[in-house]
């Protein structure tokens, strides 16, 4: 098994992340959309790479004041079941001590992702009805509180 490092998102990761997006999501981000995040001062994106520089996955988060909103967590099919998604979430949270909370939406039927987020300290806080399309599905809204007393 290859050694995985979590590194800042960079221009050389864009095309591989776009490929992962196409493999994982029914409404994937484009390369242009991902490239715009490189210059977005409100974006916190991290990339998981192996020792050969292959992109294994990524996480993207946007911040507004002291709030974080995870846009996507994705792991390439060839790298799944190795704890990479968990490492990405944990590293993002570790780098977010300046935030009061981080929140995300997850398909209500995505039990593995819900278990991952729960294991990383997220708790369900609501539902967004018909949030997803292709297929239409509710989203479970989950939040991790990073500062005491803000629940």
Segments and roles (model prediction):
Residues 89, 110-113, 130-135:
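Short glycine/proline-centered loop/turn elements that form peptide/ligand docking sites
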Residues 8-80, 86-95, 145-150:
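Acetyl-CoA-dependent GNAT
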Residues 117, 122, 142:
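Conserved active-site tyrosine of GNAT-family acetyltransferases
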Residues 76, 80, 107-109, 134:
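Residue-level recognition of the GNAT/N-acetyltransferase active site
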Residues 103-105, 123-140:
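Conserved catalytic-core motifs of GNAT/GCN5-like acyltransferases
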Residues 3-6:
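Extreme N-terminal starter segment of soluble prokaryotic enzymes
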Residues 20, 99, 119-120:
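Structural motif
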Residues 96-106:
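Conserved GNAT acetyl-CoA-binding A-motif
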């Amino acid at each position: 098994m290859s050694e995985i490092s979590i590194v800042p998102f960079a221009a050389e990761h864009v095309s591989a992340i776009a490929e992962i997006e196409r493999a994982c999501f029914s409404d994937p981000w484009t390369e242009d959309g991902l490239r715009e995040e490189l210059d977005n001062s409100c974006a916190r994106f991290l990339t998981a790479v192996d020792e050969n520089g292959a992109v294994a996955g990524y996480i993207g988060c946007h911040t507004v004041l002291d709030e974080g909103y995870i846009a996507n967590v994705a792991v390439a099919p060839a790298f799944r079941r190795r704890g990479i998604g968990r490492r990405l979430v944990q590293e993002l949270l570790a780098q977010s001590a300046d935030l009061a909370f981080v929140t995300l939406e997850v398909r209500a039927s995505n039990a593995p992702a819900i278990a991952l987020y729960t294991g990383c300290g997220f708790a369900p806080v609501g539902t967004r009805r018909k949030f997803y399309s292709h297929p239409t599905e509710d989203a479970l809204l989950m939040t991790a509180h990073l500062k005491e007393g803000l629940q």
